[in-house]
């Protein structure tokens, strides 16, 4: 192993072992109403912002996160600390009365809680707005619209904090106090190259699924099978969690695993459990690991420092990933390496990993860069005009926005939704049913041909007669995670009475598992009138991975039970009483799950 050869010594960070930065920060922000807290990954930000939150009088304290797994993780941590905690994501809602904390995704806060006034808001992992422009909008809308009494933005190091402060003040019309820290709780050493045979207790970073697979193959070839006791423990856990992926399990038997978006939630949970219990010591993943998935490791190892189409990664992302090394309470220090053994097939050919490693250490952190996407739903709901939306995007994007181009794009989308989308889809539905060959010919003697044409036109008119219903409701059902085209296509099919099973197959079952989960979110967002038959997506998901919906919180929701009874024509007085009983049973199970602190953790974003 090549360590501490002196080449990168000047970049090492010595740990703040006496927690002095936390003490100083707590004193500095104690009496501040609105705070930006910028501090490196692994520096102990959580302790500081929780102390600040407790000095505020407004309850509950709402903590947002960019992905569900992080909300679940925070929820469990606060439960373990003895607080009354609510959890609300796209799949689970459990919010007790008078709770101390509510943990939720950023979208949930923006769409549901931003109007609450006497609350304290903590927006965690705020640096996510720079990683994902399409998701940045929900953060900026929350900052702009939030009526919370106190707000704290918590983030990893972000370039010139004075520029971030100026931007946040402008968006929120608040006066934020900014506190910047560059200290860690444990020392971090930048070491250079590491031999692949020496890799243990590590996060290995790469940027493609293919690279993950190749790295795992290489590690598997060089490692020995673990001892019998560990293998038996892995088998028991796999049986309990219903894991049957042979390649996946075989890697775990040698203490290694990949971690990426294509894994099922139960597989991700299995990896996390194995890691916590010491049965896996090395995880290979993408830069999504920068979002805080909890793998306490001693080493972070880069197999590439440039992406194929984007070039070298940013200094901000590098530090967020490198900061995962040496988590306090697990290791006394952390180490950051690159690995030439893997860089040969991971790094794009035009780059040299050692060269990039040195250059990125010399770089300064990048300043804030935000490019906002349009909020089409706001316009459809008449919350903003097109002109106001363009002004909002132009005002709060940090890069130059082409006003005329943006206005043209949004205008075209709104025109498409209101004037073209329904008719276009109806024409396709007619063709799918009758084909393109039928036309009316007054000279033909083929009566069957003309009869089919008449049927086709009658069917077309029947569908077109439903346009008013489409126009009256598209704003209500518009799903921000889908494109305008997909929103219009699916809702037109629902309005036109296309069989739910066909809609399920086309939009809910044709992609990967994450697409199924996204379609489920869409269905849940629909008014009850339009959900008929589509809630079967829950059963389809459960067949693949029941933990994605249920965790340990019961098998079927009351809402689902009610809808099924109604569909079956059995929603009579006796059935209603049964539903109420099921509701009490469900509440009892959920309370027991909270008490035992066994809430499932699962991540649904693509990693």
Regions found by a protein language model. Give the residues of each.
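N-terminal helicase ATP-binding lobe
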Residues: 1-375, 385, 393-427, 434-438, ...
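Catalytic adenosine-cofactor/nucleotide-binding cores of aminoacyl-tRNA synthetases and other
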Residues: 380
């Amino acid at each position: 192993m090549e360590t501490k050869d002196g080449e990168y010594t000047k970049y090492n960070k010595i740990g703040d072992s006496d927690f002095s930065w936390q003490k100083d920060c707590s004193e500095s922000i104690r009496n501040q109403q609105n705070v930006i807290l910028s501090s490196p990954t692994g520096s102990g930000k959580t302790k500081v912002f929780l102390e600040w939150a407790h000095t505020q009088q407004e309850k509950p304290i709402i903590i947002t996160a960019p992905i569900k797994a992080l909300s679940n993780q925070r929820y469990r941590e606060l439960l373990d600390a003895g607080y009354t905690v609510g959890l609300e994501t796209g799949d689970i809602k459990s919010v007790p009365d008078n709770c101390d904390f509510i943990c939720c995704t950023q979208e949930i806060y923006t769409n549901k809680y931003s109007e609450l006034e006497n609350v304290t808001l903590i927006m965690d992992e705020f640096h996510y707005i720079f990683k994902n422009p399409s998701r940045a909008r929900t953060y900026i809308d929350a900052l702009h619209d939030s009526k919370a009494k106190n707000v704290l933005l918590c983030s990893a190091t972000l370039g010139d904090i004075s520029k971030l402060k100026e931007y946040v003040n402008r968006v929120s019309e608040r006066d934020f106090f900014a506190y910047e820290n560059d200290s860690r709780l444990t020392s971090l050493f930048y070491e250079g190259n590491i031999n692949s045979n020496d890799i243990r207790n590590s996060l290995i970073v790469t940027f493609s699924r293919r690279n993950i697979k190749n790295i795992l193959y290489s590690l598997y070839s060089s490692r020995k099978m673990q001892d019998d006791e560990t293998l038996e423990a892995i088998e028991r856990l796999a049986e309990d969690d219903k894991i049957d992926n042979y390649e996946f399990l075989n890697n775990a038997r040698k203490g290694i695993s990949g971690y990426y978006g294509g894994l099922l939630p139960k597989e991700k949970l299995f990896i996390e459990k194995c890691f916590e219990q010491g049965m896996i010591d090395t995880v290979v993943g993408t830069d999504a690991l920068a979002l805080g998935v909890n793998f306490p490791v001693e080493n972070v190892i880069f197999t590439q420092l440039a992406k194929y189409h984007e070039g070298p990664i940013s200094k901000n992302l590098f530090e967020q990933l490198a900061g995962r090394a040496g988590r306090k309470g697990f290791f006394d220090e952390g180490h950051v390496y690159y690995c030439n053994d893997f860089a040969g097939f991971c790094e794009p050919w035009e780059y040299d990993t050692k060269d990039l490693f040195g250059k990125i250490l010399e770089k300064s952190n990048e300043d804030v860069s935000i490019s906002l996407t349009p909020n089409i739903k706001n316009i459809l709901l008449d919350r903003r005009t097109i002109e106001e939306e363009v002004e909002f995007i132009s005002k709060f994007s940090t890069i130059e926005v082409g006003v005329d181009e943006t206005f043209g794009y949004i205008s075209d989308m709104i025109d498409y939704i209101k004037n073209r989308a329904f008719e276009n889809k109806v024409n396709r539905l007619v063709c799918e049913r009758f084909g393109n060959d039928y036309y009316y010919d007054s000279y033909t003697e083929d009566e069957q041909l003309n009869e089919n044409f008449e049927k086709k036109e009658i069917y077309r008119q029947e569908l077109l007669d439903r346009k008013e219903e489409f126009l009256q409701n598209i704003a209500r059902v518009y799903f921000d995670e889908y494109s305008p085209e997909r929103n219009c296509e699916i809702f037109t099919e629902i309005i036109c009475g296309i069989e739910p099973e066909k809609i399920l197959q086309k939009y809910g079952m044709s992609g990967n598992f994450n697409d199924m989960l996204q379609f489920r979110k869409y269905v849940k967002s629909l008014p009850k009138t339009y959900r008929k038959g589509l809630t079967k997506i829950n059963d389809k998901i459960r067949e693949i991975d029941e933990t994605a919906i249920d965790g340990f919180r019961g098998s079927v929701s009351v809402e689902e039970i009610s809808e099924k009874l109604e569909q079956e024509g059995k929603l009579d007085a006796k059935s209603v009483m049964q539903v109420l009983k099921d509701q009490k049973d469900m509440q009892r199970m959920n309370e027991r799950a909270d008490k035992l602190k066994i809430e499932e953790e699962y991540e649904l974003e693509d990693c």
